A protein has these predicted regions:
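Active-site entrance/lid segments in N-terminal catalytic domains of soluble metabolic enzymes
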Residues: 1-178
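Conserved active-site-proximal phosphate/metal-binding subdomains
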Residues: 161-180, 186-324
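Residue-level detector of alpha-helix initiation sites
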Residues: 24, 185-186
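Conserved acidic functional residues
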Residues: 130, 183-184
């Protein structure tokens, strides 16, 4: 399936994927995204057990099928994030459940596995893989993924350090599939900019934390709204993998500034526990907080982004008059 065929299959009204966020992304957020014309996603590990995860898939599949039956209209697909790392004992078990229920999109992190891609392709599913550099991108391409998620500097949670402009250009030279760009995207103008750079879809997380449907405390959402770029801390001190967090939440949880540069062995075991107190009090976010000023329902947010996107594209025509 080529890139254009994939884009048509996604059936989007705005080229946006709401990225899967630990704890934050649950069914209400996924539904709201898909019902409003964008892709909603969630981590499999947001359900504490594989049995609970499977129930979520059954619920979504039945609801989406019923919607199509009643309206004759197909919703954009949803996606599930699988952490493909040796410290995640559920990875392959959850994959089997995804294959069983034919999850439309699988987003893989921390490991591009050819056998996984083949299993998802066996039922017509798509695989998108997180990458932070060209070396990881090549491995994912060799594994046969349909899309690469370029996690650039400033993205919330696990993030890279590359500027998005050369990053997209560098990967486009070696990959003609779908490119999703993540990192500090918060509005429709940012979505238009991502496409101007050569990406096909915008991959947006932090903006969706401050919505009515997100599973995030009032304090978390308030800190998102009140923070700027200077308040985001990039550290590997928690799990061994560099990630962006709200600095104030680190300090309040005892991770003071003197600990931010410490080196620890990669271990996602505790991080992947939704009940771990630390992950309810330590909050990830990207530099896109700088332009997030409110909390609102997903429907209103997507509607506003759609108009911002349209205005941004139209405004580019003025530059042709001025400089062409």
């Amino acid at each position: 399936m080529n890139k254009q065929e994939i884009l048509q299959k996604l059936n989007l009204s705005l080229p946006v994927v709401a990225s899967p966020m630990f704890i934050v992304s649950q069914l209400d957020l996924v539904r709201a995204c898909c019902y409003n014309g964008i892709i909603g996603t969630f981590p499999a590990l947001n359900q504490r057990t594989t049995e609970g995860f499977e129930q979520w898939l059954i619920e979504l599949n039945e609801e989406f099928a019923q919607h199509e039956k009643e309206t004759g209209k197909k919703l954009p697909p949803y996606g599930v994030n699988l952490i493909v790392h040796r410290t995640n004992p559920r990875a392959m078990i959850d994959l089997k459940v995804c294959v069983k229920h034919k999850v439309p999109i699988i987003i893989t992190s921390l490991g591009a596995v050819k056998e996984l891609v083949e299993e998802v392709h066996s039922y017509g599913g798509l695989v998108f893989h997180d990458v932070t550099n060209k070396r990881h991108a090549r491995k994912a391409i060799d594994a046969g993924v349909d899309g690469l998620i370029l996690v650039s500097a400033g993205a919330g949670g696990h993030a890279g350090t590359l500027n998005p402009i050369p990053f997209v250009a560098e990967i486009r030279e070696i990959f003609d599939g779908l490119i999703l760009l993540g990192g500090s995207l918060s509005n429709g103008k940012d979505v238009a900019s991502a496409l101007q750079m050569g990406a096909d879809l915008a991959y947006m997380g932090t903006r969706f934390i401050s919505t009515d449907e997100a599973v995030a405390s009032d304090a978390y959402q308030r800190m998102i709204i009140e923070s700027g770029t200077k308040d985001i801390v990039y550290t590997a001190a928690l799990s061994g993998i560099p990630a962006n967090f709200l600095g104030e939440s680190l300090i309040q949880s005892g991770f003071t500034q003197d600990l931010w540069d410490r080196k620890v062995k990669i271990d996602l075991g505790a991080e992947l526990d939704t009940e771990a107190k630390a992950w309810k009090d330590i909050w990830s976010a990207g530099q896109g907080v700088a332009t997030i000023k409110d909390r609102l329902p997903v429907a209103e947010l997507v509607s506003r982004m759609r108009e911002e996107f349209r205005e941004a594209i139209l405004s580019q025509q003025q530059y042709l008059k001025n400089y062409a």
